[in-house]
């Protein structure tokens, strides 16, 4: 049974892990971060948010540390941000989705409002799955570089 859905996946039953060259593409992150610096004045003119909570989910092999720049930016625009709090995102494994559901429930209860979910790459798959399973707790989903099918 698939971890995320009752539907049969169109993917093959077994997919090998990504190759080392493909995994090494993630090393481009510091250069991409540097590319944001010239855009910073424009980003600072973005409208302010309403203070609602946003949970940010990292991509594969990343953790909350890698989402700090994004979360700090969102905080500067008046959002209350949370990391996913589960260490490195090592892909679908037992307990991850259940922990994310509990975090979403707790964040929504604490704020009294729906929560926005931002997912980066694989984190976007978790965000979409949470929205599918708990739509009454989710305000919106934003995905960044997330695969879809």
Region locations from a protein language model:
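Serine-dependent carboxylesterase/thioesterase catalytic core
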Residues: 52-65, 69, 75-149
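Flexible, membrane-associating and regulatory peripheral segments of lipid-active enzymes
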Residues: 1-54, 67, 72, 77, ...
């Amino acid at each position: 049974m698939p971890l995320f859905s009752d539907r049969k996946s169109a993917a093959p039953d077994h997919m090998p892990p990504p190759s080392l060259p493909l995994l090494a593409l993630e090393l481009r992150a510091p250069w991409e971060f540097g590319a944001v610096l010239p855009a910073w004045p424009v980003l600072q003119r973005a409208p302010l948010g309403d203070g609602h909570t946003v949970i940010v989910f990292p991509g594969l092999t990343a953790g909350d540390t890698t989402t700090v720049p994004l979360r700090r930016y969102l905080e500067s625009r008046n959002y209350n941000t949370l990391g996913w709090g589960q260490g490195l995102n090592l892909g679908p494994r037992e307990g991850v989705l259940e922990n994310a559901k509990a975090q979403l429930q707790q964040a929504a209860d604490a704020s009294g409002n729906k929560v926005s979910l931002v997912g980066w790459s694989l984190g976007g798959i978790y965000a979409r799955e949470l929205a599918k399973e708990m739509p009454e707790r989710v305000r919106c989903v934003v995905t960044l570089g997330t695969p879809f099918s």
